[in-house]
């Protein structure tokens, strides 16, 4: 289950090589620390409480991830940080495994901070970390998108949890992928998702037949890495399907 930490950190590294937070680079390091603090605590807490309490925790954590990591909307950073949160929540661990998860995420945080500062140190931004919160305005299109995505993802997972359906994270990921900052893009993505989910199912079926059983646990990880390397939404959808079907195969055979 802790292999998901590697996927989460890898996706963050791939993004932070080029993306920024729209604030001073030194203050961007604070955003990275805040994001990783949420990734460490939020998923574990949400798995320790009843569904409605988990719903509230998800709202707070996802909203903070959006505020700290997604100010520069065109970077689509939410597809990395919120995805990481959902993956860690879906692959929950306890005890010594959780200790190892925390260590892995802290190491990942340091790596991300080094790469981010090295690549972004010459950015000319004057906005500070505090400004991300001071500038929050419910009337702005950006902040309305924050709220919309937060409540759609959290509500969808609440319904799954109330129905006692495992791995609620997958409906959260599906909702996140079509809840975009620019409304005109939503219809196109919704159409592509169905078509390329079918492609993903076909490729997964071939892999499931060809690969030995010892490789089955790694198909989901391959999907996570593929998402990080995919520039277009179509292939991101294909690789996301791997993870969902891996869980379905594990649960239902």
Provide a role label for each language-model segment.
Residues 1-79, 83-202, 206-222, 226-239, ...:
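Alpha-helical transmembrane segments and their membrane-interface boundaries
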């Amino acid at each position: 289950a802790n292999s998901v930490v590697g996927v989460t950190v890898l996706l963050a590294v791939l993004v932070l090589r080029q993306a920024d937070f729209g604030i001073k680079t030194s203050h961007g390091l604070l955003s990275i620390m805040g994001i990783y603090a949420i990734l460490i605590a939020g998923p574990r807490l949400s798995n320790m409480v009843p569904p409605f309490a988990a719903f509230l925790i998800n709202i707070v954590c996802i909203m903070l991830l959006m505020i700290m990591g997604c100010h520069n909307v065109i970077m689509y950073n939410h597809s990395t940080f919120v995805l990481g949160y959902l993956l860690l929540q879906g692959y929950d661990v306890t005890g010594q495994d959780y200790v190892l998860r925390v260590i892995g995420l802290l190491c990942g945080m340091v790596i991300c901070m080094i790469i981010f500062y090295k690549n972004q140190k010459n950015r000319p931004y004057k906005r500070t970390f505090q400004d991300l919160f001071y500038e929050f305005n419910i009337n702005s299109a950006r902040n309305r998108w924050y709220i919309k995505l937060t409540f759609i993802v959290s509500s969808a997972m609440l319904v799954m949890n109330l129905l006692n359906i495992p791995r609620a994270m997958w409906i959260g990921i599906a909702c996140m992928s079509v809840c975009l900052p620019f409304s005109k893009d939503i219809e196109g993505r919704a159409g592509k998702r169905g078509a390329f989910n079918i492609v993903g199912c076909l490729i997964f079926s071939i892999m499931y037949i060809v690969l030995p059983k010892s490789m089955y646990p790694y198909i989901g990880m391959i999907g996570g890495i593929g998402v990080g390397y995919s520039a277009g939404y179509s292939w991101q959808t294909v690789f996301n399907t791997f993870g969902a079907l891996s869980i379905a195969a594990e649960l239902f055979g």
